[in-house]
């Protein structure tokens, strides 16, 4: 007789409180999945207790970097898996692959690798010399897993080709949106009024938004593009009235809170506790990101709020154009004049199609995962 499904999830770093896109992606994945199947989450001891999640939460891992190579974890995790009668082990990222393979062998458990990007390619894009070593390890781990989840179709296609995986074992499980429909127009109009009052923006000025962790190199490079490429191009269009709001923590001190750009329509808001009001109140989200790999979580969040997005082609990976209507404008990487032109002409009035939420709503994503593992 087949045992009832029970998932053990190994999350090797802090995700609670979930503030950044990657943290939200894992936290929301398990919040919605734990509504459908039992989940035991094993994570580091520096996590806060999550709210609104049905999972059995076990913050038992050390915060030390050596935790990734600690052989004694095998015994403690084997005990947890056996005590909870777990049938599946989901590893967030491939780094604990060695441990997952051992647990698969000794606990007779289905091993699932939940990839958030091709890690080796992400490190290659940031200039790490050892990326090929990591690529070989990723390939080895994914080949040992019974089920592989990839964040985009592009990542799945890469893995099928370069890791020689069986297609039936590989599935695209995207980052999602908590919203099952866009916020109503009055709610968006009220949010816009609040933002204009807070940041002293004129009523006839459009609000352009960029959000991201600003000490993360791909986001910092995108900020440099906004300051040095897009701003001169936009200022050269006298018919465009706008302000760009920059949100996010970690801005290096060398940028001096962007004070030198205050006269050039740049507003630095820093880290904001309620990013939703910015997604609701902005007219346009700009995403001039060309590095980093994986799906850009901020693009999904912006579209989920009914916000028009102008993005590089690299920054739009993982978002099918067929389900976004006129809300996602994709510009070739490096064509910054074309990007500025797209900002000036973007359709901000049309709505986001229902098909977007059919694909990206977290509830639907969790149902897909349940069907795969059951």
What does each model-found stretch correspond to?
Residues 154, 175-176:
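Carbohydrate-associated surface elements
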Residues 348-374:
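A charged, aromatic-enriched C-terminal amphipathic alpha-helix characteristic of glycosyltransferases
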Residues 75-79, 105, 129-151:
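Membrane-proximal helix-turn-helix segments that form the acceptor-binding/catalytic region
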Residues 146, 280-294, 307:
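Acidic donor-binding loop of glycosyltransferase active sites
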Residues 25-31, 177-257, 268, 272-273, ...:
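Conserved catalytic-core segment of nucleotide-activated headgroup transferases in glycan assembly
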Residues 7, 104-123:
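Active-site proximal beta-strand in glycosyltransferases
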Residues 298-301, 308-313:
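Short hydrophobic beta-strand element within catalytic cores of glycosyltransferases
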Residues 1-48, 84, 237:
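N-terminal subdomain of nucleotide-sugar transferases
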């Amino acid at each position: 007789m087949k045992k009832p499904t029970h998932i053990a999830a190994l999350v090797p770093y802090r995700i609670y409180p979930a503030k950044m896109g990657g943290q939200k992606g894992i936290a929301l994945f398990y919040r919605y999945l734990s509504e459908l199947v039992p989940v035991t989450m094993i994570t580091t001891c520096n996590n806060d207790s999550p709210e609104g999640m049905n999972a059995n939460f076990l913050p038992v891992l050390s915060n030390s970097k050596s935790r990734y190579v600690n052989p004694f974890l095998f015994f403690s995790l084997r005990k947890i898996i056996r005590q909870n009668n777990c049938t599946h082990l989901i590893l967030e990222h491939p780094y604990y692959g060695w441990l997952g393979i051992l647990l698969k062998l000794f606990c007779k458990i289905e091993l699932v690798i939940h990839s958030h990007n091709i890690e080796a390619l992400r490190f290659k894009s940031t200039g790490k010399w050892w990326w090929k070593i990591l690529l070989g390890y990723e390939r080895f781990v994914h080949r040992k897993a019974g089920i592989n989840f990839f964040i985009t179709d592009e990542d799945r296609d890469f893995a099928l080709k370069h890791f020689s995986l069986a297609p039936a074992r590989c599935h695209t499980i995207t980052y999602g949106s908590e919203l099952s429909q866009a916020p109503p127009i009055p709610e968006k109009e009220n949010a816009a009024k609040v933002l204009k009052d807070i940041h002293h923006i004129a009523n006839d000025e459009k609000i352009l938004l960029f959000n991201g962790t600003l000490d993360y190199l791909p986001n910092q490079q995108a900020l440099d593009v906004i300051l040095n490429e897009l701003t001169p191009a936009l200022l050269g269009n006298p018919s465009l009235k706008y302000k760009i709001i920059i949100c996010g923590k970690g801005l290096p001190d060398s940028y001096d809170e962007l004070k030198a750009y205050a006269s050039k329509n740049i507003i630095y808001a820093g880290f904001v506790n309620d990013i939703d009001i910015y997604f609701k109140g902005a007219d346009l989200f700009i995403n001039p990101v060309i590095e980093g790999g994986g799906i850009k979580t901020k693009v999904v969040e912006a579209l989920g709020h009914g916000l028009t997005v102008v993005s590089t082609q690299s920054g739009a990976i993982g978002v099918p154009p067929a389900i976004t209507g006129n809300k996602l404008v994709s510009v070739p990487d490096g064509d910054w004049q074309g990007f500025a032109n797209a900002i000036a002409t973007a359709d901000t009035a049309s709505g986001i199609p229902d098909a977007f939420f059919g694909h990206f709503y977290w509830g639907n994503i969790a149902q897909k995962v349940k069907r795969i593992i059951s």
